[in-house]
Amino acid sequence: MELVNITCLGLGLAADAFAVSLSSGFVIQRIKFNKALKIALFFGIFQAIMPLIGWLTGLSFREFMTNIDHWIAFILLLGIGSKMIYEAYKEMDDDDKFNPLDTYTLLALAIATSIDALAAGLGLSLLKTSILLPCTLIGLITFVLSFIGVFIGHKFGSIFNKKIEIIGGLTLIIIGSKILIEDLIKPI
């Protein structure tokens, strides 16, 4: 697979992680390098590992995964997005609010945004190509875009305050819905 094609694949797969990083940046109160790094590492590592998992499982697991992957992503993003919107309206202690730095939340977000990368790995297994370069580039591109996305999101979050939490939650729900709809309406 050519470098240009792999880069384009990486950019396409990183789009959801970038959008979720923006949403995460919206709600982070005091931005620090290590906070953005944690989010970027979760997304980058998952985006790098999922194509490898997809590639290794190949065709035997492909049919099962393609039947449920969109539902998993949709449910995770719908739940997290709804929680963000709920918390924007409800008066809560800071300890109870949506925390994009919570390890379990990050794990759910990383899985939800990397399911497409798993499917891409399944597709790459059909090409009988090496998986090392695609995994590395996909992970690096996602890491960089996610890292930048947290800072951009934080900048806008500090300007718009609570409204941005609602926008962030809606963004997650829209991404989840997009994943679900695209998989449900694709030709058989």
Curated annotation (Swiss-Prot):
GO CC terms in record: plasma membrane
Q: According to its UniProt record, where is this protein located?
A: Cell inner membrane
| Pfam families named in the record | Mntp (PF02659)
Q: Which keywords does UniProt give here? A: Cell inner membrane, Cell membrane, Ion transport, Manganese, Membrane, Transmembrane, Transmembrane helix, Transport
Q: Which InterPro entries match?
A: Mntp/YtaF, Put_MntP
| Annotated transmembrane regions | 8-28, 39-59, 68-88, 106-126, 131-151, 164-184
Membrane topology term: Multi-pass membrane protein
The chain's coiled-coil residues are: none
Q: Which GO terms describe its molecular function?
A: manganese ion transmembrane transporter activity
Q: Which coarse location class describes where this protein primarily resides?
A: membrane
User: Which HAMAP family does the annotation name?
Assistant: MntP_pump
State the function annotated in the UniProt record: Probably functions as a manganese efflux pump.
* Family (UniProt): Belongs to the MntP (TC 9.B.29) family.
This chain's protein is named Putative manganese efflux pump MntP
Q: Which organism is it from?
A: Crocosphaera subtropica (strain ATCC 51142 / BH68)
> What phylogenetic lineage does the species belong to?
Bacteria, Bacillati, Cyanobacteriota, Cyanophyceae, Oscillatoriophycideae
